[in-house]
Amino acid sequence: VAQREGGAIVILKFFWKFLYIVVNEKTMMNLIIDEGNSSIKIALFEENRCKIFKKIENETVLAQFLQEFSLGELKAAVVASVVKDAEQRFSFLNNILPEVLYLNALSPMPFVNKYATPQTLGIDRLALAAAGVHHFPNCNVLIIDAGTCITFDVVTKNKEYLGGAIAPGIGMRLRAMHEFTSKLPLIEEQDYDNEEFIGNTTQSCMLSGVYCNVVQEIEGVIGLYKQRFQDLEVILTGGNHFYLQKRIKSRIFASSLVLVEGLNAILEYQKQL
């Protein structure tokens, strides 16, 4: 009897240990860090789903935010930064996470990089390409990021990143007209909802010339890529994607999470290497 009771206790202990591992495995999350020049975007992914997405000021705020989570809830982190000394400034992550990945242009990616100068390729464009492969793994994909610049990046159905194009963004175009002329005013980016494309004031002419023309430009670029690549899927993201997605007539997938989704896809890919 004693032996049977002892065996039952061992089995019960094993069961609870197994249950603890299973539960914790399901709740463990990836920490995604995208550091730009003026702010840091962070996201938490659980089983490839974004659970939290927010913008913070600096790494000190990040450290405070991470105190809300218990040991074991976070399993890995990826850091993509355009600022120097990222590994030094985020070194505290090594004390609370078993795996921290710092990305650079030569890091392994879930696609073949055909770019002629890979060392000059921004981490953001690599992450967008990875997101394209993640969302449409067997398709030709054009990823458009409408931010400070408007970038166009294409990944083939064979998972080959070819490159794309870089154009001035909306804010850059508005500032350029002011800075390179003597009389045109400085106009800030705004939610331009005027459907009338013929401006009747200098300001409305400038706004129409930027906002309406950007829509037509993107439509034209999509058309060019569709001529080259059959069954093309189009992803739109970036700070201005909310305005653009309502006006672009081509079928697109639009989301503000594309870049962090790409970073999470890269992290998951490198775990398997």
Stretches with model-predicted labels:
Residues 1-27:
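N-terminal amphipathic/basic-hydrophobic helices that include classical n-h-c signal peptides
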Residues 17-109:
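N-terminal glycine/serine-rich phosphate-binding loop of ATP-dependent small-molecule kinases
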Residues 28-47, 132, 138-161, 177:
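Gly/Thr-rich phosphate-binding beta-strand-loop-beta motif of the actin/hexokinase/Hsp70
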Residues 71-122, 156-170, 200-211, 215, ...:
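Short beta-strand-loop/turn "lid" adjacent to the catalytic site in phosphate-handling enzymes
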Residues 110-141, 262-273:
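Conserved phosphate-binding catalytic cores of ATP/NTP-utilizing and phosphoryl-transfer enzymes
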Residues 229-273:
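Long hydrophobic alpha-helical segments typical of transmembrane helices together
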